[in-house]
Curated annotation (Swiss-Prot):
Disulfide bonds: none
Role this protein plays: Involved in the hydrocarbon hydroxylating system, which transfers electrons from NADH to rubredoxin reductase and then through rubredoxin to alkane 1 monooxygenase.
Source species of the chain: Acinetobacter baylyi (strain ATCC 33305 / BD413 / ADP1)
Family designation: Belongs to the FAD-dependent oxidoreductase family.
Database matches in InterPro entries: FAD-bd_OxRdtase (IPR050260), FAD/NAD-bd_sf (IPR036188), FAD/NAD-binding_dom (IPR023753), Rbx-bd (IPR041364)
This enzyme's EC code(s): 1.18.1.1
GO MF annotation: an example: rubredoxin-NAD+ reductase activity
A Pfam family it matches: Rbx_binding
GO biological process, one term: alkane catabolic process
Protein name: Rubredoxin-NAD(+) reductase
Residues annotated to bind FAD: 9-12, 33-34, 42, 80, 162, 282, 294, 325
Protein's UniProt keywords contain Protein transport: no
Recorded name of the encoding gene: rubB
Lineage: Bacteria, Pseudomonadati, Pseudomonadota, Gammaproteobacteria, Moraxellales
Amino acid sequence: MHPIVIIGSGMAGYTLAREFRKLNPEHELVMICADDAVNYAKPTLSNALSGNKAPEQIPLGDAEKMSTQLKLQILSETWVKAINPETHELKLEKNGQETIQPYSKLVLAVGANPTRLAIAGDGSDDIHVVNSLIDYRAFRENLAKRQDKRVVILGAGLIGCEFANDLQHTGHQVTVIDLSPRPLGRLLPAHIADAFQKNLEESGIHFVLSTTVEKVSKINDGQDYAVTLANGQTLVADIVLSAIGLQPNIDLAKHAGVHTSRGILTNSLLETNLEDIYAIGDCAEVNGTLLPYVMPIMQQARALAKTLSGETTHVHYPAMPVAVKTPAAPLTVLPVPVDVDVNWETEEFEDGMLAKAIDNTDTLRGFVLLGATAGKQRLTLTKLVPDLIPAQL
């Protein structure tokens, strides 16, 4: 029998391999990835500085260690050029050499790529993105060379705010730019976003909102950058970091005939429309929902591992709050499903506030907890929210 093949060595790929091995220690398992296959937890990148973690301390294991630990054949630095669903084969390329890899079941754990803005100027190619440990290593190396520690971050979403807090906490001057009028504008009601912003500003982070970057130019013999904004303002930075969001990596799947929308479309069994092809992680749009967070990956991996072991199992999405790593403004969010209309009910405390999202049936559908006092209600509130994808027997 041909092996089960996982494309991707991120958290989704490795978590699935680990869960599968708990259930089936023998079936041949192959992982294919374009990078070096080092296993690490990507969420740790946005607070590694304040945790005194150097890039070399972040990995959990290299390809050799993971291959031994999980009884897994790893084809690193290998590109999947095409999927042939009819023959159950992949066309691979490494160092200019093409090979064919057969599969019995194929799992797409290909993640998401950073969104890149079209920005003018001779400094635009120097803008950092951090979507991998390799990216992060380059960012930290550049950061260590800089004298004035002025960092401009493009994007006031989750990752932008987490990096801003981490950098500010370690002595950097941080300015965050976003087209939205408030940070975390897609996740938070306006009044909570305002309070969140105020807390971060009190810690020393600067926000320039309702505008965007038009140009990044090298100045001072290439040592610094002039960041020109659409509102006419110019900022001087030692480093520019882009954190404006991620786009699920759907091209490989799409070319193979897999149905895609924002992500790779799957049902609650994580099956795509093509036989024996599955998707998990940041690339997977499960029952019409994209959830690029850690807990959904864990739920997906456990369910799919069982299915691949012969026990058909639907993924179960309970209410899964997201803890935002911004100690200057402790925040937990349970996002409201996109198709649900809600009214927000707010309770204020000395150190923050709590907001509940109530739908037209008087059911709690989400919440936001800002500050330590509100944060204590996380477990109680989570139990009141209906499952996003109910458990199936």
